[in-house]
Amino acid sequence: MSRWLLVGLAVLIIAPAARSEDLPPKYRAVVDRGLKWLVKQQHRDGHWEAAGSNFASAMTAMGGTVLLMEGSTIRDGKYSENIRKAADWLMERVQRNGLIGDPNAANQGLGYMYGHGFSILFLSQIYGEEEDGERRRKLEDILTRAVQFCVRAQTSRGGWGYVSAQDGNDFDEGSVSITQVQALRAARNAGIVVPKQGIDKTHEYLKKCTTPRGGLIYSLQSGGGGERPTITVAAIASMFSTGEYTSDLAKRWLKYVQPLVPIESVGRDQFGHSEYTHYYYAQVIYCLGEDGYVKMFPESKESERLTWSRYRNAFFEFLARTQNADGSWNGVPIGQVYTACCYLTILQLDNGVLPIYQR
């Protein structure tokens, strides 16, 4: 199975602008059908999984986060029970060393660091809402140990690989690295202590991974692997989530990506991994809003400027047109659960329910 199948999981959503009630009824119906389909795919014990019963930890964390975006919490709302079951499933699989997930399970897919990162993200948001004292203390302990494991798993170059640096011979990979950066940020936002030097090392790592053209390479240790637009978009979203909207590095990355993913070709993309490339790109353009691009590039022509309204109109129409009658979308090889989570994330960017998604 291709390593790129989980690239699209590597980034958080950024910054709300409008409430979901501003969506036309047609798109609200698309979201409702998609969420109803997604919860039907949840197993009785609370987990989701991808095709071939793979990536259970990552899919469970991502599915739970999508339901949180709807506005439900672990206590209240239409999907509160689904959220609680997902959280319980992950909490029951914490290892002594702090890893969230079973490193020996067949359904870990390519490696356990993806699932670990997304589990930190999901549980950090649960922790911020948990009112039960005993359960809150348990979550704090889990997240503290999970952060410590994440820091120990970092490679000497500042990135992360599919498994820890010790288990993976210090191998790094861009999409996994960004997953861990976002996980650490979510934990810090929730009040968990996160060593600053680990995040600083990753920032330097991403700089070193950037080519003269502005694209990010696949791996620093392996000497490259070519420029990857998907990882580059993920890096922009990661940079934006830290408040660095106009850094020179973010500008270089965006200038590299923009001609490769034109808004005019939404739904007609001629490159691989378009679902998760747009998963990233939607987040980036959403953060830019209507005037963010011109603030980054004051000399840009009006026809060049990326705006959320323009992108949203094109992509939401595509999602409405391609949704199946049961609420699903046809999936890439990793499966329909993953595809639905990507698309439902994009469709709910305007909700702005969770602190981690706010400017």
Question: Model-predicted segments: where are they?
Answer:
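Bacterial N-terminal signal peptides
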Residues: 4-15
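Small side chains
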Residues: 8-10, 64, 87
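An alpha-helical repeat/solenoid feature that recognizes helix-turn-helix modules
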Residues: 20-33, 44-82, 95-200, 208-314, ...
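Calcium-coordinating acidic loop motifs
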Residues: 42-43, 324
